[in-house]
């Protein structure tokens, strides 16, 4: 079949208009390649575009997946005959790829046997799996208060600088290194430095082996802050396509980490404006819910294999009612909300146990004891929150004996919900802790039952199990 070739007629930043013969206009989401053959340019142009709009009379408006520096009118645009296709399969493990599936790790080409388009249908309703099984993360506050669902979708919500990426990196460290299946990390519009750190940490942890990729268990797909909006909008789909292949063809339990889903929405807003759409609430794109739904509906577990996804969600100006985080909420099985007031108290991870939720925190899934302890912890923390105004105005001495005891236990619980992380060890100097769920439930049960009312609250800070707390209390006693 003869090549379908068009001509670039307008370049305005990442938006490019291309003229084709009307009979051979490429379809929406088709990929085009612009080349600088015959043009005298300092660096050769070889840029992938994605068709977004048909303007009529053979003209299509496209969004570039790479910078359009040096592109001029008159350049050739070759229709690639289908959507952007990326390499998938075991050959992607250990590699760092960009939105169009090209390696960016200077380790040579990806020798993949299979390529798949990034635009695909979500699995049919009757193919989806509906099991309910808890997924242990080793992070106390998560396992106790908002347990993660195996094969579910989890959101980490937080404003700027409260620790979303650190929590995601700890989950990767705890889960990817102990987990038997494959992991895919999609870096969507986040810092390049964090992407580099993660790649190096994966090598140290043995999750990636750059000397023998066949021993690696993770693939990294990056579209960082420096990329044009087209790349940031589509890189989540590229990562998801790699994860879908492991789920459907390998039947593997796959982990998909996305940092940050808000940048996906932000890039969509930029693209929407470039395409001339009328903005909707707070300046977001009018198709925000549709775009989010198309991505989220594909992140699911089927009868062949599971995809458990953990998504960081930036909350602009700490406003949970902002359309971007509010639209994401609807798709999740568990939400972990990171709180600025807690991070200011030095409690890390700064998870707000009262604002975080999980669909599987029920006796039927986690067991009666776990459920009762989690509700007991929430009850004590809620009562403490209710009493804070009285304490601020009148002082703690004006409380009843019972309320003073509740406040004392709540402060211990709050401190005990902190935990040293492996990935933060180099900053804190405290070795990381992985806490088994049985130890976590037992430890908190003892605290809320009042077995450790005599232990000073400072002993509970940054500890793993109750045994470590008692050991610290003995040291404090001996030092007096």
Swiss-Prot record:
HAMAP family linked to this entry: ATP_synth_beta_bact
Known function: Produces ATP from ADP in the presence of a proton gradient across the membrane. The catalytic sites are hosted primarily by the beta subunits.
Reactions mediated catalytically: ATP + H2O + 4 H(+)(in) = ADP + phosphate + 5 H(+)(out)
Lineage, opening ranks: Bacteria, Pseudomonadati, Acidobacteriota, Terriglobia, Terriglobales
UniProt entry tagged with the keyword ATP-binding: yes
Signal sequence coordinates: none
Alphabetical list of NCBIfam families matching this protein: atpD (TIGR01039)
Domain of life of the native organism: Bacteria
Subunit-level organization: F-type ATPases have 2 components, CF(1) - the catalytic core - and CF(0) - the membrane proton channel. CF(1) has five subunits: alpha(3), beta(3), gamma(1), delta(1), epsilon(1). CF(0) has three main subunits: a(1), b(2) and c(9-12). The alpha and beta chains form an alternating ring which encloses part of the gamma chain. CF(1) is attached to CF(0) by a central stalk formed by the gamma and epsilon chains, while a peripheral stalk is formed by the delta and b chains.
Annotated Pfam families: ATP-synt_ab, ATP-synt_ab_N, ATP-synt_VA_C
Subcellular location: Cell inner membrane
Name assigned to this protein: ATP synthase subunit beta
């Amino acid at each position: 079949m003869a090549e379908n070739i068009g001509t670039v007629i307008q370049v305005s930043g990442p938006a490019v208009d291309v003229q084709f013969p009307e009979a051979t206009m490429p379809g929406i989401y088709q990929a085009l390649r612009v080349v600088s053959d015959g043009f005298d340019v300092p660096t050769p142009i070889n840029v992938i575009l994605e068709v977004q709009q048909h303007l009529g009379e053979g003209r299509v408006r496209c969004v570039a997946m790479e910078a359009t520096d040096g592109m001029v009118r008159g350049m050739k645009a070759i229709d690639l005959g289908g959507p952007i296709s990326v390499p998938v399969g075991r050959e992607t493990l250990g590699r760092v790829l960009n939105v169009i599936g090209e390696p960016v790790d200077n380790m040579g080409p990806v020798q993949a046997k299979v390529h798949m388009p990034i635009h695909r249908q979500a699995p049919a309703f009757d193919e989806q799996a509906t099991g309910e099984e808890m997924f242990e993360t080793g992070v106390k506050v998560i396992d106790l208060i908002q347990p993660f669902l195996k094969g579910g979708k989890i959101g980490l919500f937080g404003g700027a600088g409260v620790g979303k990426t650190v929590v995601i990196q700890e989950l990767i460290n705890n889960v990817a290194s102990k987990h038997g299946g494959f992991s895919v990390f999609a870096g969507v519009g986040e810092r390049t430095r964090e992407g580099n750190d993660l790649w190096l940490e994966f090598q140290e942890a043995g999750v990636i082996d750059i000397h023998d990729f066949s021993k690696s268990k993770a693939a990294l797909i990056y579209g960082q802050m420096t990329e044009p909006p087209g790349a940031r909008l589509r890189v989540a789909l590229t990562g998801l396509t790699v994860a879908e292949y492991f789920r459907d063809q390998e039947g593997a339990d796959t982990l998909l980490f996305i940092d940050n889903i808000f940048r996906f929405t932000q890039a969509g807003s930029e693209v929407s404006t470039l395409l001339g759409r009328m903005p909707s609430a707070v300046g977001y794109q009018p198709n925000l819910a549709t775009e989010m739904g198309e991505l989220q509906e594909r992140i699911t577990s089927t009868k062949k294999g599971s995809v458990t996804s953990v998504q960081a969600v930036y909350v602009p100006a700490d406003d949970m009612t902002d359309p971007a985080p509010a639209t994401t909420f609807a798709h999740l099985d568990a939400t972990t909300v990171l709180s600025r007031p807690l991070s200011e108290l030095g409690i890390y991870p700064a998870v707000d146990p009262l604002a975080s939720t999980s669909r599987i925190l029920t006796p039927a899934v986690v067991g009666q004891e776990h459920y009762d302890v989690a509700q007991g912890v929430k009850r004590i923390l809620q009562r403490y929150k209710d009493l804070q105004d009285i304490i601020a105005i009148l002082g703690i001495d004006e409380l009843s004996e019972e309320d003073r005891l509740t406040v004392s236990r709540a402060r211990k619980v709050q401190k005990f919900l902190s935990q040293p992380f492996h990935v933060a060890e180099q900053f804190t100097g405290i070795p990381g802790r992985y806490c088994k769920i049985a130890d976590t439930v037992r430890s908190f049960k003892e605290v809320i039952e009042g077995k450790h009312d005599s232990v000073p609250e400072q002993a509970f800070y940054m500890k793993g199990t109750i045994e470590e707390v008692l050991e610290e209390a003995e040291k404090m006693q001996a030092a007096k």
